[in-house]
Structures are given as structure tokens and as C-alpha cells.
């Protein structure tokens, strides 16, 4: 699971649009998550009599979802197959082709800006360790008040010297203990409410998609020359690591009190928190203002150390032993995996029999295999390249409505559902690693699916845009990689019975079924509520009261509701009716009913056969009884051998024969 806030952010970003054919309401809510990683499109006038709707659910950071919302519609529109009206082929080409562009260096640089990595480059762990160990030693001799001043984020002489040398291209974050993945959560939070020129993005794009142009504008050039203008997640973290380990326990209390006071005096009452998460070992999460400027100011004036001194010391000790990073914010791992102690088992085998020894050997073998899988998963995640688009990605469910023809392309576990006279028609399939088709592809590509349904212990979905760390098998095409961007395509002709469709991320579908969502929306449409208001009420209904459960109701939530108007029926349709999802479902149901009938017939035949078998068994029983009686008669006939038999023994024998025959 990802990091959670102490209180959910329930403010929503909502829009309502309409034309003569459609009415659309969309909304998104951050919820309990540390940052908002969803994005969406709602483009009514995408093309002539054509609309485009999409929901992108990001993981490992918001940058890929934001970039998709900003660029994917135009990418699709420029394809020759789209221009030729081959929409099904065009959607597949768009997903696979757009996913490939995420490896382009120029695109990666844009993703880095979205992820908050501008002017930050990775370096080897040894370089960081040498610098920080030296600084730790130096800071251990400083007076306490100077250390506390640095915790407050006040500029010191070293900081001024660093700013004077900011023309160096390879500016590095100085602490290996806070290096983590990158501050994707911070970037998503900072850019969530950015405003972009409407001409630079598709109409109807979600507000989170604005970050690309905003970051590439004036700030992009200025930030490349002045790191002080960049949101630096290390503002308070640097000085935290430079405190002597021996002084941590005595300084932590004073630091905490000072931090709380500073927090209360922060601008606009916003909090800016850096939290060390011990389970992910150097993972950095941030929460605070959505405004980039406020984050810059608060990072200088506010810092709350929410990790205990024990947690901090444990992070330092573990960092000295090894370097380890997770693949995304949704991935949790067990840092204390131990190899099974086989020595005691071997010694005990000497006193047990061979069978017990075999059982112990099997148990040890199972444990070793489990540990080997765990180690392989850990190594995969530890060696994952920390770069946007490689260790981050997004699901995508895209709806292209051309006339009355609806094409739905889906990769991942977001979903699209149509309400036809109150009945839910699912227009997408959730792609999960444990599914037979998905698991087969993952294993063929060299991956593993864990018992909790994760690919190599990381992602809990099997198709997505981005995540190129899982797409490195050079012998296989893109659509056959562990994580594939190939979408499933479903088609439908909109009829007068079709009322609306709902696109939403798994934050909704993990809590409510398709039928429940359809009924929820229908009830509120009868009350003439705005579509965006219905989305907001849907979020409130799904929101968990706390984060103590299994994570259901704690995710980001995004939904788009599209209501079909009567005039839409005047438009033409070109999809062959026998290829639409409703017809395929009906055919599938007929086949299912036929199989059920055959099964019932077999059961009926089986019952008759059982009856015949019962009659046959009774007849056999009668024959057996007759044979036994004849044997009894023979036994009762005196013979020379038993004429002198003892009467008592003879009586016992007769009773035994009678009982056996009955």
C-alpha cells in the first residue's frame, strides 16, 4: 500500500460540460493518499461528431498519468489509422506507440519535470555515503542551536556556498538516507492545481495534466539555472541526517517541540511533512500545499520530523549495510526476510525415522523456495532504474464515441460501465496478474506472480503505460512483456435504452460493483442532480472512515459520467451489430445456457442410471442371498466329518451363517 495522510483530503476538483449530444460530469478527489496520482480527459468536441473520455490511474508517481492526459488524445488523432476510420486498430496503435515514446530522452526530461526531479540526478551510493559520513562527523561537533537552525531550514554558510556553485550541471542530493525513489508524491501535490494555457492542452483535460506546460514554461529555464527555485524535498532532510547518531536521542525531543511551533506559524496554516517510512528504507513522502510557491516557502520555514529516533537510527544502520529502493509507492516489502535455519533440522533428523526426515526435508525445501522467490523479487525491485516511465506508470481506460459507435480501450484495472435500462454492461476487463492469461504472459516473459497478486513483488496490475522496468525482455514484442500496454478493445452501438456510462479508477471499483455504481447514479439522476455532484457523492460513499482496513476506500478517486441525449440516436453507426459487446454477451449467455441444459440432461441421465444401478444391485443382492441360503442348506446337511461335531460349536456356526446371509 502507499503512504496515507493522517486525515483525508476530501476537496474535489469537478467540471460539468454539455452539448446537443452529451452531458458530462467529472470529478477527482485525493482522499487518504499522500498525493493525487490520477488524471482524466473529458473532451466533448474531439473531432466531427466524436468525443474522447479517459481516466488514468497513476502509480509510482503522477507524471505518466499527467503526461497521458496532456498528449495521448493528440497522439491518437494524428495516427493514419484514426484518420482512415480504423478506430479499433488506431486505439491499439495509440497505446503501444505512445508507451514507446515514454523511453525517448526528450520525453523522459518532461516526465522528470513533472516528477519534481529537475536539477536532480542520481549518483552512485558510494559518492553519497562518503559525503554524508564526513558531514555526520562534522555536525556531531556543532552546537545544538546550529543544528536546530538547520532543521528549521534557515540558510547556513554551506547552503550559501552551495548556491554560489549552482552552475554545476550535476547537482546531487547529499543524503543517501533520504534519496529514496524521488519525490513523486511531492511533485504531484505541487502540480495538482497548476493552471495551463488552454491552447496547450486538449479541452476537457484534467487539471493535473497542466503540469507539463507549466513546468516547461518560464520556470523550466529559471530552475535549470537556480536550484533554489526548485521544490527541493531535501530542504530539511539534509540537516536531519547530519546530526550525530549519538546525539539523536537527546536532540529529538527538542527538535520535535521546535518543529511543532514552526508548523503552527506556517504560511496559510499548511503543513509540510517529511516522513521516513522504515518498511521502504529511505522512501520519501511529502504532504502540503498544492501551490508550488507555498511549498518552496514552507520547505524553508517548516519541518516536522515524524519519525522517531529509533526509526531514524534504523534507517541509517540499514543504509550502511546495503542500498535498497522500492519500485513504486504502492509497493511494501518485508525487510526482515531470514533464511531458514536448517542446522537444527539436520540434527533432529538423526533421532527421527525416515518418514519424518522426508517431511522435514520437504518443509525446508518449500521455505528455501519461498526465500529464493522473495530474494529474487527484492533484487528485481532493488535493481530497478529510478527514472520516470521506468519505475512509474498508469492504467488507462479510453472511450472514443464516434457517432453512435462506442470504442473502449483498456489497459489495467480502471473500468468503463454502460447503464442499459438499469442493467450494467461492463465495457472493460480488469487486468490482474493472477488471471490465467495475464499470469501466463508474465511467466513467459521471465516474471513471477506472488501469492498476493503482484508482479515480481511489485505491481498489483498486469497492463499499464510506462513501467518500462518490467518491459526489458528483448526477445519479446511490446505486447508480450511482463507488463503490457496492449489494450483490450470492446465495442457497442448506443441505443435508446442506453442511459449513461461511467469511467472510473479502481478506487471506486474496489469498493462498489458495476451494478451498484449504475444503481447509485440512476437514483440521483432521477433527482436531477448535476453529474459532477453525483461523482462527488460517489467518492464520499466510497471513502473509508480510516486507514486501518485493507486499503479499500483509501485510494485516489476519479470518475467521469457521460449521459447520452436523445439526439445522439440521429447519428449513424458503422460497427457490425454482431461485433458489439451486448451481442457477444448474449451469445455467451446462450452458450452458457446450452451448456447448463446439457449438464442438467446429464444429471437427469445420471439419476436414471443410478436408479437402474440400484435395481441391478438389489437383484444381485437377491442372487447373493439365494446363493448364501443354498450354501447354508449344504452346511446344515450332515456330513461324515461333522456328524460327531460338538453341539455348541454347531449352534455357533449356524448363527454365524444366518447373520452373514442376512
Swiss-Prot record:
GO term, biological process aspect, one: signal transduction
Disulfide-bond pairs as recorded: none
UniProt keyword Phosphoprotein present: yes
Cofactor: Mg(2+); Mn(2+)
Cofactor: binding details: Binds 2 magnesium or manganese ions per subunit.
EC number, as in UniProt: 3.1.3.16
Keywords from the UniProt entry: Hydrolase, Magnesium, Manganese, Metal-binding, Phosphoprotein, Protein phosphatase
Gene Ontology CC terms: cytoplasm
InterPro entries linked to this entry: PP2C, PP2C_BS, PPM-type-like_dom_sf, PPM-type_phosphatase-like_dom
Start-end of Basic and acidic residues biased regions: 616-637
Domain PPM-type phosphatase: start-end pairs: 23-564
Domain of life per record: Eukaryota
Bias (Polar residues): 238-252, 261-275, 288-319, 337-347, 591-609
GO molecular function, one term: protein serine/threonine phosphatase activity
Family indicated by similarity: Belongs to the PP2C family.
Protein name in UniProt: Probable protein phosphatase CG10417
The organism of origin for this protein: Drosophila melanogaster (Fruit fly)
Phylogenetic lineage: Eukaryota, Metazoa, Ecdysozoa, Arthropoda, Hexapoda
Amino acid at each position: 500500500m502507499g503512504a496515507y495522510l493522517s486525515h483525508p483530503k476530501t476537496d474535489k476538483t469537478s467540471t460539468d460540460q454539455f452539448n446537443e449530444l452529451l452531458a458530462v460530469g467529472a470529478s477527482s478527489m485525493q482522499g487518504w493518499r499522500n498525493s493525487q496520482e490520477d488524471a482524466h480527459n473529458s473532451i466533448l468536441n474531439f473531432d466531427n461528431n466524436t468525443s474522447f473520455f479517459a481516466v488514468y490511474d497513476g502509480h509510482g508517481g503522477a507524471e505518466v498519468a499527467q503526461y497521458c492526459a496532456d498528449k495521448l488524445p493528440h497522439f491518437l488523432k494524428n495516427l493514419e489509422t484514426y484518420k482512415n476510420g480504423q478506430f479499433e486498430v488506431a486505439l491499439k496503435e495509440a497505446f503501444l506507440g505512445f508507451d514507446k515514446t515514454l523511453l525517448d530522452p526528450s520525453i523522459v526530461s518532461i516526465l522528470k519535470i513533472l516528477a519534481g526531479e529537475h536539477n536532480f540526478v542520481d549518483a552512485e551510493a558510494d559518492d553519497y555515503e562518503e559525503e554524508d559520513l564526513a558531514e555526520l562527523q562534522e555536525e556531531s561537533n556543532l552546537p545544538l542551536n546550529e543544528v536546530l537552525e538547520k532543521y528549521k531550514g534557515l540558510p547556513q554558510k554551506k547552503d550559501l556556498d552551495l548556491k554560489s556553485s549552482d552552475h554545476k550541471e550535476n547537482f546531487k542530493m547529499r543524503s543517501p538516507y533520504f534519496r529514496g525513489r524521488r519525490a513523486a508524491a511531492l511533485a504531484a501535490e505541487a502540480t495538482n492545481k497548476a493552471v495551463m494555457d488552454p491552447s496547450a492542452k486538449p479541452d476537457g483535460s484534467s487539471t493535473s495534466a497542466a503540469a507539463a506546460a507549466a513546468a516547461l514554461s518560464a520556470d523550466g529555464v529559471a530552475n535549470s539555472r537556480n536550484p533554489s527555485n526548485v521544490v527541493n524535498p531535501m530542504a530539511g532532510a539534509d540537516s536531519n541526517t547530519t546530526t550525530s547518531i549519538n546525539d539523536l536521542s537527546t536532540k529529538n525531543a527538542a527538535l520535535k517541540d521546535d518543529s511543532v511551533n514552526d508548523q503552527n506559524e506556517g504560511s496559510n496554516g499548511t503543513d509540510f511533512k517529511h516522513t521516513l517510512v522504515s518498511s521502504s528504507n529511505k522512501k520519501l513522502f511529502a504532504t502540503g500545499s498544492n501551490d508550488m510557491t507555498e511549498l518552496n516557502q514552507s520547505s524553508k520555514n517548516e519541518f516536522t520530523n515524524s519519525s522517531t529516533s529509533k526509526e531514524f537510527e534504523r534507517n541509517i544502520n540499514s543504509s550502511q549495510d546495503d542500498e535498497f529502493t522500492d519500485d513504486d509507492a504502492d509497493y511494501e516489502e518485508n525487510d526482515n526476510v531470514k533464511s531458514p535455519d536448517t542446522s537444527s533440522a539436520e540434527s533432529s533428523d538423526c533421532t527421527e525415522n525416515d518418514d519424518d526426515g522426508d517431511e522435514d526435508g520437504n518443509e525446508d525445501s518449500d521455505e528455501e523456495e519461498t526465500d529464493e522467490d522473495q530474494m529474487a523479487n527484492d533484487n528485481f525491485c532493488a535493481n530497478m532504474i529510478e527514472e520516470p516511465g521506468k519505475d512509474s506508470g498508469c492504467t488507462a481506460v479510453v472511450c472514443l464515441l464516434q457517432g453512435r459507435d462506442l470504442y473502449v480501450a483498456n489497459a489495467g484495472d480502471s473500468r468503463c460501465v454502460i447503464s442499459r435500462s438499469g442493467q450494467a454492461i461492463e465495457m472493460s476487463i480488469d487486468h490482474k496478474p493472477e488471471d490465467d492469461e495475464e499470469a501466463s504472459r508474465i511467466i513467459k516473459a521471465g516474471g513471477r506472480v506472488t501469492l498476493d497478486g503482484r508482479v515480481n513483488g511489485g505491481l498489483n496490475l498486469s497492463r499499464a503505460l510506462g513501467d518500462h522496468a518490467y518491459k526489458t525482455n528483448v526477445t519479446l514484442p511490446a505486447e508480450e512483456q511482463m507488463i503490457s500496454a496492449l489494450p483490450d478493445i470492446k465495442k457497442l452501438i448506443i441505443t435508446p435504452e442506453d442511459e449513461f456510462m461511467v469511467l472510473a479508477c479502481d478506487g471506486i471499483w474496489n469498493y462498489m460493483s458495476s451494478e451498484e455504481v449504475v444503481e447509485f447514479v440512476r437514483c440521483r439522476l432521477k433527482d436531477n442532480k448535476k453529474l459532477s455532484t453525483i461523482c462527488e457523492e460517489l467518492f464520499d460513499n466510497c471513502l473509508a472512515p480510516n486507514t486501518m482496513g485493507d486499503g479499500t476506500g483509501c485510494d485516489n478517486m476519479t470518475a467521469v459520467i457521460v449521459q447520452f441525449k436523445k439526439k445522439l440516436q440521429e447519428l449513424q453507426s458503422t460497427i457490425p451489430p454482431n461485433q458489439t459487446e451486448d451481442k457477444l454477451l448474449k451469445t455467451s449467455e446462450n452458450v452458457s445456457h446450452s451448456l447448463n441444459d446439457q449438464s442438467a440432461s446429464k444429471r437427469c441421465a445420471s439419476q436414471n442410471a443410478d436408479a437402474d444401478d440400484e435395481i441391478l444391485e438389489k437383484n444381485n443382492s437377491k442372487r447373493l442371498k439365494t446363493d448364501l441360503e443354498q450354501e447354508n442348506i449344504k452346511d446344515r446337511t450332515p456330513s461324515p466329518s461333522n456328524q460327531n461335531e460338538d453341539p455348541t460349536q454347531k449352534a455357533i456356526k449356524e448363527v454365524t451363517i444366518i447373520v452373514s446371509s442376512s
